[in-house]
Amino acid sequence: MEILQFIGYGNMAQAILEGAHEILSKRFILEITGRNPEKIAPFLQEKNIQAQIVPYKDAIDIHQKFVFLLFKPYNLKDFNYQGQAKSVLSALAGVGFKALSDAIDSLHYLKCMPNIASKFALSSTAVCEKSPMPLISQKALSVIESFGNCVRVGHEELVDASVATNGSALAFLSLVANSLKDAGIREGLNARGSLELVKMSFKGFAKLLEKERPEMIIEQICTPKGATIEGLSVLEKKGVRGAFIEACHKSVKKMRL
């Protein structure tokens, strides 16, 4: 059985392991390593995840393994890598294929941008490959698909750009959810009830978005001289649409520095 090695044990690694370990453990032997990989032991025990913790000594043995990089981008050169990997899957924001190949020897490279919805196998993940190899590519992509859906893009820079739509976007949507909850409280709902209503609204919206374009959803809800169009006019006047676009742009720009 192939080995899938996670280098890194932070929030993203934990989200992916939580959402995908049952599928991945049927296809791979799971390893976790990094500077202090023992830190993830309580999490593995709590979630009943079968993975081998490999202490870091002088170098990380990557030979003939599928290697998933899930640490901070600036730590790429902090490790020594021994051998040639079959595939390097990188979730390192702003790190291109050249930097990856300079640091780690591998037959295949894949850049991806997952998000923390991976813990429910609901990540929407942009991916781009360097020199695709049919059998290796298939297995590497199956790793990504184990924690959500996989959207291929034609250039590595577009993976970084996807932080606007599926990376930072979840934090921005959390701000929206919190604002709607507080709006409900302002109008007289208690905090618990308001949050429950917002949760279901998001679930319903997600279903609508599967079938409808955003502008069509707006059109179906708004009525002439109605309450919703009155509220939307305030949001447009305050520049909310432009603020979201600019916030996403700033996030992508920051990542590319």
UniProtKB/Swiss-Prot annotation:
Molecular function in Gene Ontology: pyrroline-5-carboxylate reductase activity
Source organism per UniProt: Helicobacter pylori (strain ATCC 700392 / 26695) (Campylobacter pylori)
GO biological process: L-proline biosynthetic process
Highest taxon above the source species: Bacteria
Pathway assignment: Amino-acid biosynthesis; L-proline biosynthesis; L-proline from L-glutamate 5-semialdehyde: step 1/1
Annotated EC: 1.5.1.2
Catalytic activity as recorded in UniProt: L-proline + NADP(+) = (S)-1-pyrroline-5-carboxylate + NADPH + 2 H(+); L-proline + NAD(+) = (S)-1-pyrroline-5-carboxylate + NADH + 2 H(+)
Keyword vocabulary terms for this entry: Amino-acid biosynthesis, Cytoplasm, NADP, Oxidoreductase, Proline biosynthesis
Pfam families linked: F420_oxidored (PF03807), P5CR_dimer (PF14748)
Protein location: Cytoplasm
Claim: Amino-acid biosynthesis is one of the keywords in the record: yes
Protein name per its UniProtKB record: Pyrroline-5-carboxylate reductase
Cellular component GO terms, alphabetical: cytoplasm
The family this protein is said to belong to: Belongs to the pyrroline-5-carboxylate reductase family.
InterPro entries xrefs: 6-PGluconate_DH-like_C_sf, NAD(P)-bd_dom_sf, P5C_Rdtase_cat_N, P5CR-like_CS, P5CR_dimer, Pyrroline-COOH_reductase
Biological role stated in the UniProt entry: Catalyzes the reduction of 1-pyrroline-5-carboxylate (PCA) to L-proline.
Encoding gene per record: proC
Lineage: Bacteria, Pseudomonadati, Campylobacterota, Epsilonproteobacteria, Campylobacterales
